C-alpha cells in the first residue's frame, strides 16, 4: 500500500468505519444451498454497476422473484471504498487496485503495440462491481454519440440522446456546484438536464487545489471553453465547474451501486435474493429447446450448484466476463467453440470482438513553491491536520477531492490545421489498407465525422493534482500529473476463452496502438499539454518526460508513449447492441440474438465508445433495461 494512502486511512479510517450506519438484511442469510433451492423468475449474473440497478428495479414488482449472483462480497461501509482519496489513491495506484480482496486483477495478453508489455486490468470484485473502485467520474458523452446508437447502429429512435435523457435523470441525485473556475455559479443549464430524486449522488468538488483554477483558465485562454453545461449533449472543452463525481456531499463518501441500489429497502424485500462469493460458470439450457435458458450453474470454492430461472437470465458481468460466460455456455464464434469441444448453441461470430478501451498516457510537472497540490497531505503536517479536521467535522476538503480538470476536447482544437490534415490523410490511407467488419465501417465513418466536425470530443485531458502517476515524486515537492487519452480510440481488441475451465480468466487483448491514429493523436495531445500547462504560470519545470522532450522526434514520443501507456479501465463493446447485419450481439431490448430469454445489460453492449467514463451511461442503460424487462414480462 503506498505510504500516502496509508496516511490517509490512518487519519480518517477508524472514524469513518464507526460513523457509518450498518445495513442489515431482514431475511435469513443466503447460502449457496439455500439459493439453489429458491424459486426464481429472473437470475441476474453480476451484482455490479448494472446488475444492482436491475435487482432493485425488478424487485419493485411483486410479480417477480429476483436472484443475483455476485462473485465478490458485500463491503459497504468500507473506508477503502468510501473515502475518495483512499480508493482512488491519488492517481490510479493504491489500496484497492491490485488488492485481491477488491480487484479481480485481470491482465492483458502481451500487447504487440507496446513491445510485449502486459497491462493490469482492475475490475471490481465486490458488491457494486467497478462502481466501488473506479475514479468516481460521472460524465455523459455528446448528443452525437448517443444519436449514433439509435441511428447508425440500427437501434431505433428510443436510443437517441433525447430519448435516453429521462433514464440518465432517473438514477441521479444531483447537487449543484458551489465553486467555479471563472466565478460564474449559474448552473441553471445543468439543473435542467439532471435528476434530483435518484439513487446515485452526483456532486462537484467543494475544495480546489492550487492548480484547478489556473489550469482551467489557461485552457479557456487557448479557446477551449468554458462550457457551462457539459451534460446537455455538448460534453467538450473545459467545464466551468470542473468534473462531476459520484460523491455524496452529506457524507463525503462514494455513492455507488451497492449503497445506492442495495440499501435497507432492497435488503428487506422477500422477493430479492442475493448470493455473494459465487462465480457463475455457465448457463443451463432447456433440453427440448436448446436456445432457452432455464437456469445457471455457479461455483463456490470447489463446489458447484445450480439454480433455476423460470423466465430470464440476465448477464451483467461486465465487458470482460459476460462474453466468457456465453462462450462457456456454447454461444459465440463457432470455430472457437468447436476448437474447445464446447457444443454450439448459437453461432455469434462477433461476440467478444469489438473491445474498445480508452488508455491513459501521463506526463508530470513540478509546480512552483506555494502551489497547493494533494502532495501537501504527505509533505505538510499543518495542511494535513486542517484537512483531517475538515473531513471529520464537515465531510469536506482534500479528502473528498477528485480530479477537477477533466476536459474531453476535439483534437482538431489542439493541433494546427496542417497537422490535422496530415493525420487525417494518414488515417484514411491506413483504413483503406485494412479489411473491416461492417460494424467497424460504421464506427470509423462516425469517428471521421466527429473529427472533421471539430465539435465532438475526440481526445481527453485529465489533471491529477499530485505526483506519482508517471515517476516517483521527490520528497517535499508538489506535482501534477496530466493524463492524455483518445476519447474514441480506433484500435479494436477482443476478449475470449482459451479453456473450458470456468474459473480461468479470459484472454484480454486490448490491441493498444494497433491503429496508428491512436499513437499519433496521443503524442500530439501530449505536446499540447506542455504548451497548455506552461501558460498557467504554476509550473516550475517538466518532470517526466524532461524539458529536453520539447525537441523530441515523433518516434521518440511514441517510444515514450509505449513505455507509460496504461488502461483507463473503461472497456466496452464486446457484445455490441447493433443490427444483425452489422454483426450485433444484442437487440435494442438487450436480448442476445438467437436466444429466447437471455439478455446482456452492462457496458459490453455499447456499440461504440461514448468518449467519456462509462459509469454514467451504464447506470442509464440499466434503468432502461429494467423498464424493458418489466414490460416484456408483464411485471409492472
From Swiss-Prot:
Its cofactor is FAD. Armillaria species are both devastating forest pathogens and some of the largest and oldest terrestrial organisms on Earth. They forage for hosts and achieve immense colony sizes via rhizomorphs, root-like multicellular structures of clonal dispersal. One genetic Armillaria gallica individual localized in Michigan's Upper Peninsula stands out as exceptionally large, covering hundreds of tree root systems over approximately 75 hectares of the forest floor. Based on observed growth rates of the fungus, the minimum age of this large individual can be estimated as 2500 years. Keywords: FAD, Flavoprotein, Glycoprotein, Oxidoreductase, Signal. Belongs to the GMC oxidoreductase family. Glycans are attached at residues 99, 253, 333, 380, 394, 498. This is Dehydrogenase ARMGADRAFT_1018426. SUPFAM superfamilies: FAD-linked reductases, C-terminal domain, FAD/NAD(P)-binding domain. Residues 1-19 form the signal peptide. Dehydrogenase, part of the gene cluster that mediates the biosynthesis of melleolides, a range of antifungal and phytotoxic polyketide derivatives composed of an orsellinic acid (OA) moiety esterified to various sesquiterpene alcohols. The first step in melleolides biosynthesis is performed by the delta(6)-protoilludene synthase PRO1 which catalyzes the cyclization of farnesyl diphosphate to protoilludene. The orsellinic acid synthase armB produces OA by condensing acetyl-CoA with 3 malonyl-CoA units in a three-round chain elongation reaction folowed by a C2-C7 ring closure. It comes from the Eukaryota. The lineage of its organism: Eukaryota, Fungi, Dikarya, Basidiomycota, Agaricomycotina. InterPro entries: FAD/NAD-bd_sf, GMC_OxRdtase, GMC_OxRdtase_N, GMC_OxRtase_C. The keyword Flavoprotein applies. It holds the Pfam family GMC_oxred_N. Its EC number is 1.1.1.-. It is an enzyme of class 1 (oxidoreductase). The keyword Signal applies. Pathway: Secondary metabolite biosynthesis. Melleolide sesquiterpene aryl esters are cytotoxic secondary products with anti-cancer potential. Armillaridin shows therapeutic and radiosensitizing effects on human esophageal cancer cells. Armillaridin induces autophagy-associated cell death in human chronic myelogenous leukemia as well as of hepatocellular carcinoma cells. Armillaridin can also inhibit the differentiation and activation of human macrophages and thus might have potential to be developed as a biological response modifier for inflammatory diseases. PROSITE patterns: GMC_OXRED_2. FAD binds at residues 49-50, 70-71, 104, 134-137, 280, 603, 614-615. The active site is at residue 570. GO terms for molecular function: flavin adenine dinucleotide binding; oxidoreductase activity, acting on CH-OH group of donors.
Amino acid at each position: 500500500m503506498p505510504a500516502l494512502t496509508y496516511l490517509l486511512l490512518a487519519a480518517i479510517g477508524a472514524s469513518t468505519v464507526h460513523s457509518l450506519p450498518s445495513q442489515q438484511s431482514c431475511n435469513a442469510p443466503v447460502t449457496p444451498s439455500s439459493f439453489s433451492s429458491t424459486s426464481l423468475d429472473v437470475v441476474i449474473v453480476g451484482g455490479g454497476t448494472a446488475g444492482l440497478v436491475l435487482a432493485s428495479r425488478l424487485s419493485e414488482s411483486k410479480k417477480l422473484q429476483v436472484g443475483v449472483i455476485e462473485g465478490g462480497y458485500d463491503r459497504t461501509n468500507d473506508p477503502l471504498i468510501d473515502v475518495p482519496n483512499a480508493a482512488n489513491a491519488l492517481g490510479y495506484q493504491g489500496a484497492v487496485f491490485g488488492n485481491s480482496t477488491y480487484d479481480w486483477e485481470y491482465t492483458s495478453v502481451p500487447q504487440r503495440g507496446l513491445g510485449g508489455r502486459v497491462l493490469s486490468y482492475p475490475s471490481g470484485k465486490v458488491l457494486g462491481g467497478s462502481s466501488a473502485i473506479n475514479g468516481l467520474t460521472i460524465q455523459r458523452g455528446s448528443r452525437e454519440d448517443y444519436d449514433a446508437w439509435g441511428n447508425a447502429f440500427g437501434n431505433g429512435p428510443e436510443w437517441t440522446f433525447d430519448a435516453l435523457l429521462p433514464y440518465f435523470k432517473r438514477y441521479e441525485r444531483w447537487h449543484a456546484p458551489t465553486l467555479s473556475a471563472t466565478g460564474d455559479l449559474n448552473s441553471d443549464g445543468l439543473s435542467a438536464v439532471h435528476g434530483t430524486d435518484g439513487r446515485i449522488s452526483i456532486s462537484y468538488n467543494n475544495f480546489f487545489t492550487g492548480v484547478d483554477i489556473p489550469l482551467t483558465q489557461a485552457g479557456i485562454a487557448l479557446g477551449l471553453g468554458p462550457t457551462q453545461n457539459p451534460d446537455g449533449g455538448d460534453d467538450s472543452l473545459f467545464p466551468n465547474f470542473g468534473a462531476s463525481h459520484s460523491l455524496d456531499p452529506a457524507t463525503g463518501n462514494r455513492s455507488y451501486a451497492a449503497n445506492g441500489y442495495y440499501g435497507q429497502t432492497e435488503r428487506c424485500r422477500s422477493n430479492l435474493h442475493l448470493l455473494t462469493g459465487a462465480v457463475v460458470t455457465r448457463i443451463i439450457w432447456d433440453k427440448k429447446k436448446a436456445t432457452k435458458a432455464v437456469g445457471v450453474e455457479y461455483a463456490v470454492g470447489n463446489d458447484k450448484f445450480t439454480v433455476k430461472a423460470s423466465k430470464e437470465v440476465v448477464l451483467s458481468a461486465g465487458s470482460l466476463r459476460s462474453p466468457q460466460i456465453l462462450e462457456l455456455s456454447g454461444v459465440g464464434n463457432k470455430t472457437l467453440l468447436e476448437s474447445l469441444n464446447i457444443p454450439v448453441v448459437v453461432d455469434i461470430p462477433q461476440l467478444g470482438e469489438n473491445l474498445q478501451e480508452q488508455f491513459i498516457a501521463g506526463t508530470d510537472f513540478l509546480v512552483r513553491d506555494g502551489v497547493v497540490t494533494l502532495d501537501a497531505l504527505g509533505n505538510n503536517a499543518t495542511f494535513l491536520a486542517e484537512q483531517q479536521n475538515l473531513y471529520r467535522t464537515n465531510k469536506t476538503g482534500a479528502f473528498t477531492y477528485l480530479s477537477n480538470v477533466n476536459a474531453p476536447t476535439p483534437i482538431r482544437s489542439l493541433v494546427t490545421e496542417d497537422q490535422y490534415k496530415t493525420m487525417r490523410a494518414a488515417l484514411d490511407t491506413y483504413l483503406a489498407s485494412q479489411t473491416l467488419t461492417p460494424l467497424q465501417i460504421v464506427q470509423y465513418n462516425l469517428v471521421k465525422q466527429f473529427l472533421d466536425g471539430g465539435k465532438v470530443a475526440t481526445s481527453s485531458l485529465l489533471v491529477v493534482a499530485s505526483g506519482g502517476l508517471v515517476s516517483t515524486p521527490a520528497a517535499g515537492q508538489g506535482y501534477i500529473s496530466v493524463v492524455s487519452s483518445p476519447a474514441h480510440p480506433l484500435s479494436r481488441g477482443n476478449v475470449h476463452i482459451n479453456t473450458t475451465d470456468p474459473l480461468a480468466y479470459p484472454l484480454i487483448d486490448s490491441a493498444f496502438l494497433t491503429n496508428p491514429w491512436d499513437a499519433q493523436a496521443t503524442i500530439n495531445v501530449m505536446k499540447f499539454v506542455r504548451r497548455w500547462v506552461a501558460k498557467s504560470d504554476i509550473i516550475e519545470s517538466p518532470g517526466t518526460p524532461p524539458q529536453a522532450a520539447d525537441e523530441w522526434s515523433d518516434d521518440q514520443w511514441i517510444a515514450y508513449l509505449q513505455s507509460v501507456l496504461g488502461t483507463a479501465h473503461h472497456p466496452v463493446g464486446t457484445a455490441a447492441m447493433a443490427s444483425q447485419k452489422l454483426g450485433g450481439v444484442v437487440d435494442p431490448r438487450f436480448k442476445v440474438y438467437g436466444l429466447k430469454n437471455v439478455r446482456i445489460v452492462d457496458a459490453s453492449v455499447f456499440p461504440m465508445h461514448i468518449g467519456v467514463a462509462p459509469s454514467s451511461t451504464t447506470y442509464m442503460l440499466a434503468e432502461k433495461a429494467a423498464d424493458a424487462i418489466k414490460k416484456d414480462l408483464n411485471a409492472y
